[in-house]
């Protein structure tokens, strides 16, 4: 935020105009800002100034806050280090977004939960919704899962897995093998995935600093 403050001051001094620094009033549909992000010209931009951030911005080409939120989330180890069919979930997301790969869902019941992220598990909230849908987790159980993911509690995750598999088998939406595969995605997200509210807040700051 300090770099954003300095940018505003510089603009005012250079052009002799008063720049409205109220970041809450910046339009979120400014093409020049999105072009800058999509071109990877993001040095000094919150969350996107690293080489990885610039590279993924050029590949994912976000054009709104929701897509920018996804980009920030798939930069985390949960997606970067989860390898499925020879490539990371990060690259699966990007390739599906760019129509290089077809969007597919491991099970049709996951479509409403994962449709916004091209069938890829990106956010903690999605993991919780999957546990609710597939295994019938109640709010307390879902909150335990959230803490296990957010705080990387391996011992807690092992207990949650046992409960998930038992409840999923009892509910009968998916087979035991399918439940094990689905939970393996959730386990991978334990390596560090974002909750969506956090990621959206970061996306807003990224856009504002790019602006």
Residue positions per predicted region:
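Mg2+-dependent phosphoryl-transfer active-site scaffold
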Residues: 1-194, 201-210
